[in-house]
């Protein structure tokens, strides 16, 4: 079975990568304590049950979480997988020497006990609903790695394991040619039994038009994340079905709030008014996806329906820029203190939809006197960690346009919390707000949705006014799938390969 994707992977160690396409590959190679099914609900993976207060997995005070592991699970090399591996993975995520994308919510655990090989007891400083939703969930930061192979290294940044991983998932890696191919075969030791597919070839094809041609020639079986402009063409290709399942992935524009002139809220708000968000969504994304403003999906219980995208208002944008000290120069370009208003927008190379969006934004900003250049990067450079000199993590950008995958819990501490600014996390806005930090803290200490929702509404209202980012849309990723492939069930949360052990062709 052949999968085609347009983004390369930075490495194959789930401790060190949370890139969107990598999460799918991790679901093939690894296991977590929990996973998420095609309804977006948490389901057990290596854990026997998802902890709740009702089943006794969460203590009455909310500070102790107990996971009970399946018996008889082994790594693909035959070594037993035990509670010690879970604790070791947690320790590596918190190891400051490791180039980890973010450490939240793992840093909320005060300690972890392993009273026996099949029990993991997590002690939290405070109750944390997002911890339970995210701790060791497969396909993201938290896919469990083997202690017996990695223990003893001062850090995991450059170990051979990162290109030749041993996992506990349904498949094992046979070969990886970076930028070209991952070849995977069934794991005969997989705890659910060997998967039904004889082989998976994960092909890296950096251009989405080339991927479309591959579908038309029937040389791939799954085309991951096609562009909206390819939707109608893919629907006409015989032998393929096209899925577009709304999920928690969102396209957004992020402003570097630590870098002038975007450290001025008036400039950010001016850009929000200047950009015609509806046109960007309709013309670049063909209106397939749901327009948005904040980082809470309309499909989530935490969504505030009163917070709407900024209207297109060039006059309002110019007024705000004048208040911020910018005025038109003789050639029409804005000038302040002798400095012309020039900036770059950055995204991933090879994505036609995002390039179209960048060009539309470029046109809108030209109308208000901003010279906006387009400076795109390969995914493995744009999204690399702080320690690996990533463009976003190091703040070497003005404006960035990219997709992000929100987790099933509304807590956004990792992407918006003041304590998650790189190198401590993935708050690539570099925006810091003490009120938001307080609301995030209050929101995560309750397990009841009714007690939490008000805090997330406050955060959405604040980010609307401060504009550290502006969501373009919530996506329904378009996948073209060979009709001979059975049991491919995309997920509205996390990643799409959660049940790869059930696939048949």
Region locations from a protein language model:
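N-terminal lobe/hinge region of extracytoplasmic solute-binding protein
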Residues: 4-58, 91, 166-168
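Detector for C-terminal structural segments
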Residues: 177, 181, 186, 251, ...
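Aromatic- and charge-enriched surface segment that lines or borders ligand/interaction sites
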Residues: 50-99, 121, 214, 261
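Alpha-helical secondary-structure segments
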Residues: 2, 82-89, 117-123, 169-170, ...
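Ligand-site clamp/hinge motif
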Residues: 159-162, 187-233, 357-362, 371-373, ...
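Short helices/loops that flank or line small-molecule/ion binding pockets
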Residues: 78-80, 85, 209-219, 236-237, ...
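Gly/Pro-rich hinge or "lid" segments in bacterial periplasmic/extracellular proteins
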Residues: 37-41, 138-195, 199, 209, ...
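Surface-exposed binding/hinge segments that line
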Residues: 103-152, 175
């Amino acid at each position: 079975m052949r999968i085609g994707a347009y983004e390369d992977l930075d490495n194959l160690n789930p401790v060190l990568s949370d890139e969107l396409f990598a999460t799918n590959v991790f679901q093939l190679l690894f296991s977590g304590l929990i996973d998420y099914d095609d309804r977006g609900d948490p389901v057990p993976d290596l854990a026997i049950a998802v902890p709740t207060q009702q089943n006794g997995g969460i203590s009455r005070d909310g500070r102790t979480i107990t996971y009970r592991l399946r018996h008889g699970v082994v790594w693909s090399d035959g070594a037993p997988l035990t509670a010690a591996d879970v604790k070791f993975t947690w320790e590596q995520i918190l190891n400051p020497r490791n180039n980890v994308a973010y450490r939240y919510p793992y840093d909320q655990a005060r300690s972890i006990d392993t009273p026996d090989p099949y029990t993991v007891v997590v002690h939290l400083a405070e109750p944390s609903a997002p911890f339970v939703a995210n701790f060791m969930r497969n396909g993201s930061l938290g896919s469990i790695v083997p202690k017996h192979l990695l223990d003893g290294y001062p850090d995991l940044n450059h170990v051979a394991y990162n290109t030749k991983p041993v996992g506990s998932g349904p498949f094992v890696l046979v070969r990886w040619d970076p930028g070209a191919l991952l070849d995977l075969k069934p794991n005969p030791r997989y705890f659910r039994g060997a998967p039904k597919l004889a082989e998976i070839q994960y092909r890296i094809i950096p251009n989405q038009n080339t991927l479309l041609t591959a579908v038309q020639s029937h040389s791939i079986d799954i085309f991951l994340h096609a562009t909206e402009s390819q939707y109608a063409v893919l629907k006409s290709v015989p032998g393929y079905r096209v899925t577009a399942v709304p999920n928690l992935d969102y396209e957004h524009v992020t402003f570097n709030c630590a870098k002038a002139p975007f450290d001025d809220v008036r400039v950010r708000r001016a850009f929000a008014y200047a950009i015609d968000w509806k046109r960007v969504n309709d013309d670049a994304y063909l209106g397939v996806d749901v327009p948005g403003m904040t980082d809470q999906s309309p499909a989530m219980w935490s969504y505030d329906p009163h917070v709407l995208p900024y209207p297109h208002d060039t006059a309002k944008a110019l007024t705000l820029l004048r208040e911020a000290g910018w005025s038109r120069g003789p050639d029409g370009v804005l000038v302040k203190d002798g400095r012309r208003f020039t900036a770059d927008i950055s995204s991933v190379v090879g994505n036609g939809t995002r390039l179209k969006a960048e060009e539309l934004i470029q046109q809108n900003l030209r109308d208000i006197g901003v010279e906006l250049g387009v400076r795109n990067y390969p995914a493995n450079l744009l999204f690399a960690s702080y320690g690996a000199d990533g463009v976003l993590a190091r703040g070497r950008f003005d404006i960035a346009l990219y997709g992000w995958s929100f987790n099933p819990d509304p807590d956004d501490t990792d992407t918006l919390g003041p304590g998650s600014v790189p190198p401590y996390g993935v708050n690539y806005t570099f925006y810091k707000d003490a009120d938001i930090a307080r609301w995030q803290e209050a929101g995560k200490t309750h397990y009841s949705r009714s007690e939490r929702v008000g805090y997330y509404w406050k955060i959405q209202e604040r980010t609307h006014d401060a504009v550290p980012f502006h969501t373009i849309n919530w996506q329904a990723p378009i996948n073209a799938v060979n009709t001979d492939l059975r049991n491919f069930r995309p997920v509205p949360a996390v990643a799409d390969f959660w049940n790869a052990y059930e696939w048949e062709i």
